[in-house]
Amino acid sequence: MNNFFEVKNVDFVAGGKTKVRNMSFAIENEGDVICLLGPSGIGKTTILRTIAGLQKIKNGSIELKGKTISSSDVNVEPEDRNISLAFQENSLFPHYTVEKNILLGLEKNKGKKEKQIDLKEILDLLDLSNILKQYPHQISAGEAQRTSLARTLLTQPDLLLLDEPLSNVDQSFKEEIQIRLKKILKNLKISTIIVTHDSYEAFYLGSKCGIIFDQELRQLSLIHI
């Protein structure tokens, strides 16, 4: 039986420099959440960008639902992968309101899934209902990050990639959002890869957690909390 998603012996490269060598890991079952833990600059974002198809690979392969999407001679275009990436930095359209930015996720998802996500539920869980009419320049970095997360969730991808998803969220509110995000991911059963430098976040959100150190994935273990 094939794994739902699998990386096989891939070197992840950015700017001509190898960030992570000969990396292999898998999401065995749809809906599992894997967290990759490591400090800034270790190559976590490069891993996500490569999985999303924004960077090519020269060795190994990446497979989703039994299909090769990246290898030395295969590179499925990003828009054809049904993978959604929420960047750490602000990726909102500045001239769209928060509401319109979020609804772009629904437009991308239109007709893709039989069961649609409850928009109100996502807005409530991420505490966005009171800022829908504001523009990106009028909201905080944490609110912008949660807006981007809502938009990405609404695309209902086969694979969700989250780059430091709560790094800009105010510390006084962060734990509550972690609880809500875990609930969302469990309810939606979206397979997810989260990269973070926050060990608590990694162990709380992930069903498995891997540690990246010295250009290698040192460990990928099942988490019991």
Where are these regions (language model features)?
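Conserved ABC transporter NBD signature motif
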Residues: 60-71
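Conserved ABC ATPase "signature" region
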Residues: 67, 113-131, 183-186
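Short coil-to-helix segment of the ABC ATPase nucleotide-binding domain corresponding to the Q-loop/switch region
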Residues: 96-105
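A short, proline-enriched helix->beta-strand linker immediately N-terminal to the Walker B motif
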Residues: 154-158
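Catalytic Walker B motif of ABC-type/P-loop ATPase nucleotide-binding domains
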Residues: 160-164
